[in-house]
């Protein structure tokens, strides 16, 4: 059975005093008020200078003007939304799996598709929004309309809730280096599920020689009684990762120094050796710092001193003979486990040959 899509059409641009992208409207048989209102500029008279100032984008902000669209009833993305307004000072923390998923969906996009879009999932606290997961959403774009498969997005979110019930809908992402008039229309749909949703852009075309990653929130702006516009305000983007994600990131970073951009998985012994080498380098740095402080080359820092003292106190005090006995015992256990594993493997191989006779 075909999955229903929600078509959205964008008519020709209507001039507005806001320097932004071409306005776009959403045709609907039954207009309805927006479910999640977005903070707008305070009302002011047309003769008030503050009203004219409200129509000018502030430095560092990306304006995109669009006529306030009439709401079209569409399948809603279920789940809790961002609590309250999204302050401009809040930080967006991205996990590596987000970037990997976006790039993978872009590489697997349909033939002729200019970009891909998807839903962002994560958690919210007082000072930051942490994006921990995402999934792509099928859509079709042309010069005058965009159709988004919201039923697919609803089903995918229901599946994600079964695995991670704490993840909320935070916004959406799109590949590309700019915000188009279609982005304003798609943003309206996500505004119904998350007040002031995040719009994440990932420049997969590498226009500036790197993959630019930016996050925005939208704000209504304009002169009362005139066509309202939408201004996308940039947010601070930082990167976060769990310990398990850090292992994958370190492995991917090693491909930067490989001529063919390919690197194999290291063995357990190589991982232990690499970790030991990093610990040795860290200890050398600490010893050099201590020597510089004692010689007067560097002024002493009480915070660093307390941290080093706490680190030294955490090291267990073991008699050298006891440590050697423990190490030899662990090595013997490891050798025994290895021997039993090889013996079991040989027995299984022998059994397979006897069965096939």
Curated annotation (Swiss-Prot):
Q: Where in the cell is it found?
A: Cytoplasm
Location of N-acetylalanine modifications: 2
Q: What is the effect of changing residue 232 to V?
A: In MRT67; decreased protein abundance
Residue numbers carrying Phosphoserine: 46, 258
After translation, how is this protein modified? Phosphorylation is enhanced upon serum stimulation. Phosphorylated during apoptosis by caspase-processed CDK11.
Q: Which UniProt keywords apply?
A: Acetylation, Cytoplasm, Disease variant, Hydrolase, Initiation factor, Intellectual disability, Phosphoprotein, Protease, Protein biosynthesis, Thiol protease, Ubl conjugation pathway
Where is the MPN domain positioned along the sequence?
A: 92-222
Q: What is its EC number?
A: 3.4.19.12
Q: Where is the composition biased (Pro residues)?
A: 9-36
Q: Give the disease entry from the UniProt record.
A: Intellectual developmental disorder, autosomal recessive 67: A form of intellectual disability, a disorder characterized by significantly below average general intellectual functioning associated with impairments in adaptive behavior and manifested during the developmental period. Some MRT67 patients manifest seizures and sensorineural hearing loss.
User: How is this protein organized at the quaternary level?
Assistant: Component of the eukaryotic translation initiation factor 3 (eIF-3) complex, which is composed of 13 subunits: EIF3A, EIF3B, EIF3C, EIF3D, EIF3E, EIF3F, EIF3G, EIF3H, EIF3I, EIF3J, EIF3K, EIF3L and EIF3M. The eIF-3 complex appears to include 3 stable modules: module A is composed of EIF3A, EIF3B, EIF3G and EIF3I; module B is composed of EIF3F, EIF3H, and EIF3M; and module C is composed of EIF3C, EIF3D, EIF3E, EIF3K and EIF3L. EIF3C of module C binds EIF3B of module A and EIF3H of module B, thereby linking the three modules. EIF3J is a labile subunit that binds to the eIF-3 complex via EIF3B.
Which HAMAP family does this one have?
eIF3f
Record's domain comment?
The MPN domain mediates deubiquitinating activity.
Question: What is the name of the protein in this document?
Answer: Eukaryotic translation initiation factor 3 subunit F
